[in-house]
Amino acid sequence: MAGIIKKQILKHLSRFTKNLSPDKINLSTLKGEGQLTNLELDEEVLQNVLELPTWLAITRVYCNRASIRIQWTKLKTHPICLCLDKVEVEMKTCEDPRPPNGQSPIALASGQSEYGFAEKVVEGMFIIVNSITIKIHSKAFHASFELWQLQGYSVNPNWQQSDLRLTRITDPCRGEVLTFKEITWQTLRIEADATDNGDQDPVTTPLRLITNQGRIQIALKRRTKDCNVISSKLMFLLDDLLWVLTDSQLKAMMKYAESLSEAMEKSAHQRKSLAPEPVQITPPAPSAQQSWAQAFGGSQGNSNSSSSRLSQYFEKFDVKESSYHLLISRLDLHICDDSQSREPGVSANRLMGGAMQLTFRKMAFDYYPFHWAGDSCKHWVRHCEAMETRGQWAQKLVMEFQSKMEKWHEETGLKPPWHLGVDSLFRRKADSLSSPRKNPLERSPSQGRQPAFQPPAWNRLRSSCMVVRVDDLDIHQVSTAGQPSKKPSTLLSCSRKLHNLPTQVSAIHIEFTEYYFPDNQELPVPCPNLYIQLNGLTFTMDPVSLLWGNLFCLDLYRSLEQFKAIYKLEDSSQKDEHLDIRLDAFWLKVSFPLEKRERAELHRPQALVFSASGMIATNTRHAPHCSCSDLQSLFRGFAAAEFFHSNYDHFPKVPGGFSLLHMLFLHHAFQMDSCLPQPNTLPPQRPKASWDLWSVHFTQISLDFEGTENFKGHTLNFVAPFPLSIWACLPLRWQQAQARKLLLASEGRLKPSASFGSPVQSEALAPDSMSHPRSKTEHDLKSLSGLTEVMEILKEGSSGMDNKGPLTELEDVADVHMLVHSPAHVRVRLDHYQYLALLRLKEVLQRLQEQLTKDTESMTGSPLQNQTACIGVLFPSAEVALLMHPAPGAVDADSAGSDSTSLVDSELSPSEDRELKSDASSDQGPASPEKVLEESSIENQDVSQERPHSNGELQDSGPLAQQLAGKGHEAVESLQAKKLSRTQASSSPAALKPPAGRETAVNGQGELIPLKNIEGELSSAIHMTKDATKEALHATMDLTKEAVSLTKDAFSLGRDRMTSTMHKMLSLPPAKEPMAKTDEGVAAPVSGGAARLRFFSMKRTVSQQSFDGVSLDSSGPEDRISVDSDGSDSFVMLLESESGPESVPPGSLSNVSDNAGVQGSPLVNNYGQGSPAANSSVSPSGEDLIFHPVSVLVLKVNEVSFGIEVRGEDLTVALQAEELTLQQLGTVGLWQFLHGQCPGTCFQESSTLKTGHIRPAVGLRFEVGPGAAVHSPLASQNGFLHLLLHGCDLELLTSVLSGLGPFLEDEEIPVVVPMQIELLNSSITLKDDIPPIYPTSPGPIPITLAMEHVVLKRSDDGVFHIGAAAQDKPSAEVLKSEKRQPPKEQVFLVPTGEVFEQQVKELPILQKELIETKQALANANQDKEKLLQEIRKYNPFFEL
C-alpha cells in the first residue's frame, strides 16, 4: 500500500522537484503522515507557479525537510498540513528579459479538468515554513530576504480562518470560483549591499530593514471548467514600521533601484505585449458583467432563488481584475546625515549630523496592471471621489486623442492594416450619455463618417494604473545634535481635524496611468497621465530645513550621476516626453515664520500665512477654469492692454524687453497643432513636454498675519481673499525643440508651417521691421473673436518668418512666460509692525536664496545657468490700506488746546470734545462766554444728578452753529476728516493715562493703560474737579472772548451756503428732526447747522455714568446739542458734512458694545443709510481690537498692469495704473475696519474718471542687479526706483502726511536706494487738521501745490535733489520761461559775491528775530506750566 502511494506522490511531485526518489519519502499511510528530505525544486516550474516578472529568474531552490499530515476523514472541512523546515531560494536579475512564464504545472496536471474535489483539497492546504531565505544577485548589488514562522492557510471572504467549505464561493451561472488565502509571518529581514567589484564605488553601506508581524491576503478567481486563474488580488499588509536611513544607505537604495530600472522597463513592455488572455475574455465593464449575471439569474429566478442570492454574494467579493496592494498602517522614517568625510567647502554650511523625521499614516500603494481603459473604477480598493474625478478627466483625454486619430483617418482616407473594425468604447459611452455639456469638437468626427475609415479597436485599449494614498502625514523640521531635546516643529503636515476631512479622503492621493494595446505595441496610444489631489496640507517655511534638504538631495543626485556613469546606464530624464498632469488641492496653507524681536514684541505677528481654499493646476485643457475658452478670454484681456505689447516702449517699460504675449498661448487657446507636419502615412505624433502650457487656478487665496500677542492671537488679514489664474509656458524650450526638428528634417520636403513660423519671427529677428508682423499681430489681438482671425494673424506672421529663417537666435523670448490675472478687486491692509515683519521676511528669503545658490554651485562644481522669465500681471483694480498710528495732533492736541485755554482749538467742532467734562465745557464756543459759565454750572449739576437714572439718554443742548463759527467754508471742509478721526478717542477712556493696572487697553499712542483704574480714578477726579473747572473757565475766558467774536462773525457768512449743501448731500428736511430714544441706541440728528452729528449709546456701568458729558445750552432751541465727555464710552459721534470735490470722504464708527454683548443700534453710514452694526457679542479677548484706534489711508488704483522680467541676476519690475485716488478714513477702530464696517472701505468705481488721460496716472519701475548699474553704481546691489505720477490731483491731511514717515521708518538703519520721482501735471492739496498752537490763529487754510514737471532724485550718497525736467523742453522755451519769472525769483541768478553781501546785511535782522522767537517760546512755556500747576492742584493725575 505504501509503495503504491509513493508512486502516486512521485508522479505528481516529479514535476516540481529534481532527483526525487522513493527512498527520500518516509510514509505512514494509516496515520496520514509523510516526510521528505533534501528536496531540490525545479526553478522553471516555480517561476511559472509564482508568476515571477521576467527581469527576475530563480537559479536554485532547496528544502532540507518537508512533512505532511492528512486527516483522511475530514478532508472536506480540515486542510492538509504541509510543514517545511528550511527553504533556501537563490535568484538573479536579468539585464534582458528572460522568456515569459509558461503555463502553470498545476493546470497541466489537472489535464484541463474541472475544478473538483482533488483541486479543492490541494488548494485548501495549510503550509508552515520555519524559515525562508531568498538571495538575489545583481550586477550592482546583492540582497537577501529572510522570513521566520511563515504560515499560509485558507480563509473566508472576511479573512478569518474557518471551515474549508466557507473559504470559496462558486457561481455555477458564471462558471467561476473565488478562493481566499492568507500568509502571515513573525519577522521579515531585508538586507542589501553593493557588489564588490574592486575598482568601482568603494563607499557602500549595507541597507537593512526589519519588520515585525505582517501578512499577505490573496483572492483568486478561477474558471471551474479548466482551473485557470482569471484574475487575482494580492494585498501586502504591514503594521507599524520604524526605519532609520542614513544618507549613504539612501544613496545605496537609489543606486540599486536605478540599476534595476532599465531591466524592469524592458520587462514591462514585454508584459504589456503578452497580457493574459483570460482577462480579455472577461466582460470589460462591471455593468456588462452585472447585466450578464442578471440575465442568467433572471432566467432561473422563479425556479431557483438561491442561485440568484449566490450570484449576489459572488458579486460582492468578486475579483473583477488583477491587482496588487501594499498597505502600511504607520511608517516612521528617520533620515540622518552621517557623512563626516566630505570635501572641504562642501559641508561648510551644512548641519552636520542633522536628522529629519517623516511619519506617514495609512500609506497605501495599489497597482492595477490590466485595467480596461474605458472601464469604471468603482470596484477598486477604497474607491473615493478623487478616483471619479480622475476617471472623468482621463476619459476626456482619451476621447481627445481618439478624435485626433479619427480626423487623421478621414484626412488620409487609408484603412490601417491594424484596423479591427470595432467602434470605440468611449464613443459608445459618450453617445449613450449624450451629455449636453459635451464639446461639439468631440462629437462631430463620429457623425456621418464612413465605416471604412474607423480607428483601431479602442475597446482593447488597456491601462496600467498605480495609486498612492497617504491618509495623514507629519514631516518634521531638521534637528541637530546641539538642539534642545524638545520635538521639532512640523515642516509639512495635514490638518485633518481642523478641516473635518472625511475618513475616505486622503491627505495625498496620486494616480499614474499608462496606456497600451496588448495586440500591438506599435499602435499609437494616449499620453500617460498623472493625477494628484492634496487635502488640508500645511507647509512651514523653515530655512534651516530647506538648506539641509537641498544639500542632502544634491549629494544624493551627485552620487546617482556617478553611479550611472560607472554602469553606463541610460538617462531617461533627458527625454522630451509629454505627461498629462492635473493637481487638485484643497485647504492648502504655507506659513512663513517671522523673526522675533524684543522691541514691540506684543505688536509683532509671528507668522505670515498663505491660504488657498481650492487650487487646480494642469497642463491639459480639460479642467474647470483651465479650458481653451478661459485662455481665449484671458489672452484677449492682456492683448487689450497696450502695456503688454512688445512695441510698447513708454515708461515704465523700455525697448528691448521680452515679448510677453507669445504665440504659444494662442496655439493652445485655439487648439492649433504646433508640431511639424508629418507625412500622411504616419499617425500624429505625441506632443512634447516643451509644448506644454500650464494653467493654475486658485478659487480663493489670501495672506494673513497670525500670532500677534497684542490682539490675543486674532488672525489679521493682509491680502483679502480673491481668485487668481496663472498661465505659463516655456517658449524658448519649445522653439529650440522645433529648431532641432528642422535641422533633422529635409529642407526640400519639409516646409515650415504657419503654426510653427509665426511664433519664431520676432522683433529680434527683424529689428528694422519691428513694427510690422508682431506689432500688427498684437494690435489685432484686441478684437479676436474666433479661429478665423487667428489663422489670418498666423499667416501674416509666417510670411515674415520665411524670409528670415527659423533658426535665428531669439532675444525677445524668455525661458518662462507667465500670465497672472484676477477678475476681482485686490485689497491689501498693512500696519507698521506688519510692514517691519515683511522687511525682515524679505531679508530672510534673500539670504535663503543666496545660500541655496552657493550650496548648489559648490555641490555641482559649476555656476548655475542663468534663467530668464517674463511675467505679466493684470488686475482690474486694487487698493492698499495703510493702518497708521493716529497722529499726536489727532489724539492729544485737543487736551493740549483745552489746557491752553483756546476755544479756537479744533475750530470749535462738537466732535472735538476730548478731555474731562470740565475741558468739554471749555471747548465749546457759544456767542456769550459769560452766559456759558452760568449755564454750564447749572447744567453740570443737573446732568450729574439726572444721568444715573436716564440710562444714557442724551441731553439736547449746545449751540452747534456758534461752535463752528469763524472759519468759513474752506476751513470747515479741511476739518471733516479730523473730526471723524477723533471720535474713536472720545468714545473710550483711551486718551487718559493713569498708572498701569491689571486690565489694559491700547490708547492713541499704542501704550497700555488700565481699564479698572481708569473708572475708579476718573469717577473721583470728576467730583473733585467739578468746582475747579468753573474757576479755570473764568480764568481763561478773557483770553477767548476775542477769538469767539471773530469766529462768530466769520461763520455767519458761510453758514447759509454750508447748510444748503449739507441738506442736498444728506437729503435732510430743513425742519428740526426729533430725537429718537431707545434703550439700546440713540440717534440725535441736528439740523439747522453746517454739519450733522449722530450719537450712539451703549449700556454703561455705574462708574462710567459718574462722569458723563456736560450739556451746554444756548439761546436758540434749534441749535441745542448734547456733548459727551472724553471719559465716557456711551456715545460714538459721527460728523457728516459736505461732500465737495475737495472734501475728504468721511468714515463712520460703529457702536461700541459692552462686555455683556448688547446689540447696538443700526449704524448710519456716510450716505445717511442704515447699515448693520458691528457684532457686539465680542469676546473679552477681542476687546483690544475693538478699542484699538488706527488712522487709515487707502490708496486705490484701476487697471493695474504689472510686469516682471528676470535675466539671470537682473530683476526688473514695471507697474502701471490708470487712476490713483486717496481715501483718508481718519481714526477708526481696527476691528470694525477689518470687518468692512467703515463707510468708504468698500471699493467703488470712481465717478470722476478722467477720460482725457494721455498717459497712465501711475508708473513705477524698479531695477536691481548688474544691469541696473547704468543708473548708479549702488543700484546693482540696492536697486533703482523710478516713479512717475501723471495728472494726479491728490489731497492729504497733515496728520496723515506726518504719519506716513513713522509708518515707513525701519527699525534698522536702512540702505540707500537710489531713486527718481517725477510729478507731471499733478497737484497736491495739504489740509491742516492739527489744532493751532495759538488762540489768535485764523484756522488752517488748504495749501495746493501744482507741479507741471518736477523731478526728485536721490543719489548714492542719500542726498535728495529737486529740479525741473528742463531737458524735456527746447532751450529757447527754457530761456523764455526764465525771463517771465517774477523778480523775486531772480535772486538765484545774482552773482555769488552780491548774494554774500546781501546775506551779511540781513544777518542782524535774522538774529534779532531768532531772539524774539526764543523769548516768545519761553513765555509760552511758562504760561503753560502755570496753568498745569493750577489744574493739578485739583486733579493731580492730569497730563497733556
Curated annotation (Swiss-Prot):
Keywords: Coiled coil, Endosome, Phosphoprotein. The modification Phosphoserine is found at residues 444, 446, 755, 758, 988, 1103, 1106. Residues 1151-1180 have a biased composition (Polar residues). GO terms for cellular component: late endosome. Residues 287-307, 985-995, 1134-1150 have a biased composition (Low complexity). It is found in: Late endosome. Disulfide bonds: none annotated. The keyword Coiled coil applies. InterPro entries: BLTP3A/B. Residues 3-95 form the Chorein N-terminal domain. The keyword rRNA-binding does not apply. Residues 837-860, 1401-1435 form a coiled coil. It comes from the Eukaryota. Residues 267-307, 430-456, 751-780, 891-1008, 1106-1180 are annotated as: Disordered. Residues 911-920 have a biased composition (Basic and acidic residues). GO terms for molecular function: histone deacetylase binding; identical protein binding. Tube-forming lipid transport protein which probably mediates the transfer of lipids between membranes at organelle contact sites. May be involved in the retrograde traffic of vesicle clusters in the endocytic pathway to the Golgi complex. Homodimer (Potential). Interacts with UHRF1. This is Bridge-like lipid transfer protein family member 3A.
